[in-house]
């Protein structure tokens, strides 16, 4: 009989968190959700508590935690409600927990994910920023505390499945020539530059293949998402940037490929549904039911591949540059992007200004070595401040009076 895995799901109300709970619900004999966490979505967390009866529910926002606690009390549920970043770290490292789904979006996910690593947990990593901002620190922590790590991003999970089973982090000794990292290209991969300048947040969030949150949908539209995944792949698989080839594949059927020195190319295919990599990681090394519809290969009929256009999507170029420079630059890239996407989603800037903000911030901050988490967070903070100050001075965001439409201090992302 397979022992029950006890889970903490960091970011349970997001799209990855909900998909994880969908898979968990299909296997009540294998998984138990002990702790669920969210930022401030009280209603969704309340519904999850009613269905899964977790021992702990953590809301990052203190006011939301109070609201949730009141609702649970009325409902007669005994879930303990906690709040704040320290509580996220606590439930990620509980002694009774063996598996942590790290699905918090953004830099807020770094500290609890590191806590899980320091506690030697089995980590299912969906939070990009942990590797993008603190890749060396995180991977060193995984090794130091003998934690285990499985990637949840569909592309990295596909690479993991396509590499040799006992891959040791060395492409040459494993007979691997390069990694082929696929990208859908997002909703605008054929759009001209003039069209891109008029893109609305609603259009950017309408991904043709995947169901995702708003922030990652915009990242997909700018191809920053793929740039961040290049950085992730570097740390996950110990692959240099020049050995990672991005391939635009609009159908999102092939999730990534590994090319070997004998000419073989191994690929992982499947319907674009995040429950597939989630189920793979939850059940590993076994295979478990995910609820994903069987792929109709005859209906697909045709698969297309294109080289990425760095002029149309400069965010991808900027990500490669940040990885090549190393040090604090990936953290700077990520923070500037988070600010830029936030103001774009608020309708404050055009779509094409997103890479301009990021490039300005990267040019304004000198490269520095990263030695600990404090260095990472300092780089993150400085990049955000630099982005906000630049935003506050730009002519395109001024009203008829000439005053800025918003001031930098309004944005605390």
Curated annotation (Swiss-Prot):
Catalytic activity: 2-C-methyl-D-erythritol 4-phosphate + NADP(+) = 1-deoxy-D-xylulose 5-phosphate + NADPH + H(+)
Pfam families: DXP_redisom_C (PF08436), DXP_reductoisom (PF02670), DXPR_C (PF13288)
Binding site for Mn(2+): 153, 155, 229
Listed GO biological process terms: isopentenyl diphosphate biosynthetic process, methylerythritol 4-phosphate pathway involved in terpenoid biosynthetic process
Keywords: Isoprene biosynthesis, Manganese, Metal-binding, NADP, Oxidoreductase
Gene3D superfamilies associated with the record: 1.10.1740.10, NAD(P)-binding Rossmann-like Domain (3.40.50.720)
Binding residue positions for NADPH: 13-16, 40-41, 127, 129, 213
UniProt: 1-deoxy-D-xylulose 5-phosphate binding residues: 128, 154-155, 184, 207, 220, 225-226, 229
Name of the top EC class for this enzyme: oxidoreductase
Swiss-Prot/TrEMBL cofactor(s): Mg(2+); Mn(2+)
GO MF, one annotated term: manganese ion binding
Pathway: Isoprenoid biosynthesis; isopentenyl diphosphate biosynthesis via DXP pathway; isopentenyl diphosphate from 1-deoxy-D-xylulose 5-phosphate: step 1/6
Annotated EC: 1.1.1.267
Coiled coil: none
Function text: Catalyzes the NADPH-dependent rearrangement and reduction of 1-deoxy-D-xylulose-5-phosphate (DXP) to 2-C-methyl-D-erythritol 4-phosphate (MEP).
Protein family membership: Belongs to the DXR family.
Protein name according to UniProt: 1-deoxy-D-xylulose 5-phosphate reductoisomerase
Species per Swiss-Prot/TrEMBL record: Nitrosomonas eutropha (strain DSM 101675 / C91 / Nm57)
Lineage summary: Bacteria, Pseudomonadati, Pseudomonadota, Betaproteobacteria, Nitrosomonadales
